[in-house]
Amino acid sequence: MAHETMSFQAEVKQLLHLMIHSLYSNKEIFLRELVSNASDAADKLRFEGLADNALYENDPNLRIRIGYDKAARTITIDDNGIGMSRDEAIANLGTIARSGTKEFFTKLSGDQQKDAALIGQFGVGFYSGFIVADKITVETRRAGLPANEAVRWESAGEGDFTIDAIERAQRGTTITLHLREGEDDLLSSHRLKSIIQKYSDHIALPILMRKEEWDQEKGEMVLKDEDETVNQASALWTRSKSDVTDEQYTQFYQHIAHDHQDPLTWTHNRVEGRSEYTQLLFVPAHAPFDLWNRDYRGGLKLYVKRVFIMDDAEQLLPQYLRFVKGVVDSADLPLNVSREILQESRDVKAIREGVTKRALSMLEELANAEDDAGKEKYKTFWGAFGQVLKEGLGEDHANRERIAKLLRFASTHGDTDAQDVSLADYVSRMKPEQSKIYYVTADTWQAAKNSPHLEVFRKKGVEVLLLTDRVDEWMLSFLHEFDGKPLASVARGDLDLGELNDEEKKAQEQAGEAIKPVVEKMKEALGDKVKEVRVTFRLTDSPSCLVADDNDMSGYLQRMLKAAGQNAPAMQPILEINPEHALVKQLNADSADFGDWCHLLFDQALLAEGGMLDDPASFVKRTNALLLSRAA
């Protein structure tokens, strides 16, 4: 096949500019990324080799070899993994196939440490070679293809690259970096080994380099024709916990999660019994950019008897734990396991149950930490993944109680929007005669905190949970009680504070009788806008509020459904009025502007709970007219 020159995809040009000009101070990452890619190529060969053993071509010992040539000023990274065909080389090295290209560029922060980590996360690590090289040559042959179908790809990291057909006996890929001026410090065994041991010690493949020894005559270190393994070269999860340092766990996490930050916590154990497997699970410190995308692929890396099977085995974890990263290595699953088999396998169901329990135990340890560092970690976790965890109440009935104990909310107990109150905390502070856990839902913490529905609760010193996450209304349809105490909305149905409001009830009944004619006329004036108008004792400072009937959808949920473009059933709220408020006391059912006052009280109540007016212009006109009549 003839020599061919092709242009990079536009995003690649932008990326190359970033690599060369923005990440220089963190240049060591080039080796981390290229070794990681070589490891992935070996994993892919193992997986495809399960179905076709001939792909190994009588060379079953997989390895990565790193070399350098001082005279030529080159570094080579060579693997005998799956390799690439011509089309794959163009697709993998000339374009960014992933849909997250735009997100990649919007995530760049200018912090070189963080930006360097994003490179791996977005699958563009190959281009990091241009940080230290002004030309990269890739020679590759895909396993199973004849020697004359190998490919040479070459680029100087500018606008284009060349593709040539070559002969290559060895399957796999050899990447040659032609170093830029000033990068000669990398042409040293000691330097390259230190980078490998820093970033890639956990790679399960042996990483080989030629041995080096002192030559007395030359007075320098010289390379020998003998290889040595420069990394641990064993799957980290197969080692005993006592043999793995925290730093090694952290490096391994950063490798599999493509994350620059340390994990919040991890757990590592071997399970024996009905199913035998090893699990190594990590909780990240921050959410990935695409956690809420519909096509987000969570899941764990699945190995069977140390053979890599797949990257994102979603069947091993429920959806609400999709943020958990890690590895499961099963001793029981067949090596030819497919996603279809995973869905039906009893062994997988047993593993899923065990992994879920272990992940929840990990979160419980964080949540119950007594020390400040542990508390801070759970706060970080909740900020990143709290909304995802709430999904578990509807998804995982068996573990619902455990999940409920992990939930955190803002509340009226503190004047802050921090979600740090557990349901157990709330119950421990309940009044002796209080029988329910009270909550209010709203779009924002400010709206929830200032809701008129809270007035009587403040007066009585009763704590109310302030729920402002979009998932909360859905969550509440599964969370009906905690510790035997039912959850109750302060904006739904008749408010019953038990013995806490006996006096108010008597006063309410008396006041209700006194203004009964006004209440009846208000219902007439508002018509179908409301289901009912009634006197309330839940207000102390506001003249009116809206509440939903016990079996009706809340106003907040209606607004949320409409915002999502869904049809929300038309609901009639109940208008409650405060008979002690000066505005209500002055209502005259026989006055000409009585209807305007009724609509004003309704509209005010709707606005106070974060609702939208159907006709803002009429509201303004009506308000102005009433103000003018009062002024006159």
Swiss-Prot record:
<dbReference type="GO" id="GO:0005737">
    <property type="term" value="C:cytoplasm"/>
</dbReference>
<dbReference type="GO" id="GO:0005524">
    <property type="term" value="F:ATP binding"/>
</dbReference>
<dbReference type="InterPro" id="IPR020568">
    <property type="entry name" value="Ribosomal_Su5_D2-typ_SF"/>
</dbReference>
<protein>
    <recommendedName>
        <fullName>Chaperone protein HtpG</fullName>
    </recommendedName>
</protein>
<dbReference type="GO" id="GO:0051082">
    <property type="term" value="F:unfolded protein binding"/>
</dbReference>
<dbReference type="InterPro" id="IPR020575">
    <property type="entry name" value="Hsp90_N"/>
</dbReference>
<keyword id="KW-0547">Nucleotide-binding</keyword>
<keyword id="KW-0143">Chaperone</keyword>
<keyword id="KW-0067">ATP-binding</keyword>
<dbReference type="Pfam" id="PF13589">
    <property type="entry name" value="HATPase_c_3"/>
</dbReference>
<comment type="function">
    <text>Molecular chaperone. Has ATPase activity.</text>
</comment>
<dbReference type="InterPro" id="IPR019805">
    <property type="entry name" value="Heat_shock_protein_90_CS"/>
</dbReference>
<dbReference type="GO" id="GO:0140662">
    <property type="term" value="F:ATP-dependent protein folding chaperone"/>
</dbReference>
<dbReference type="InterPro" id="IPR037196">
    <property type="entry name" value="HSP90_C"/>
</dbReference>
<feature type="region of interest" description="A; substrate-binding">
    <location>
        <begin position="1"/>
        <end position="339"/>
    </location>
</feature>
<dbReference type="InterPro" id="IPR001404">
    <property type="entry name" value="Hsp90_fam"/>
</dbReference>
<dbReference type="GO" id="GO:0016887">
    <property type="term" value="F:ATP hydrolysis activity"/>
</dbReference>
<dbReference type="InterPro" id="IPR036890">
    <property type="entry name" value="HATPase_C_sf"/>
</dbReference>
<feature type="region of interest" description="C">
    <location>
        <begin position="560"/>
        <end position="632"/>
    </location>
</feature>
<dbReference type="Pfam" id="PF00183">
    <property type="entry name" value="HSP90"/>
</dbReference>
<keyword id="KW-0346">Stress response</keyword>
<feature type="region of interest" description="B">
    <location>
        <begin position="340"/>
        <end position="559"/>
    </location>
</feature>
<keyword id="KW-0963">Cytoplasm</keyword>
<comment type="similarity">
    <text>Belongs to the heat shock protein 90 family.</text>
</comment>
<comment type="subunit">
    <text>Homodimer.</text>
</comment>
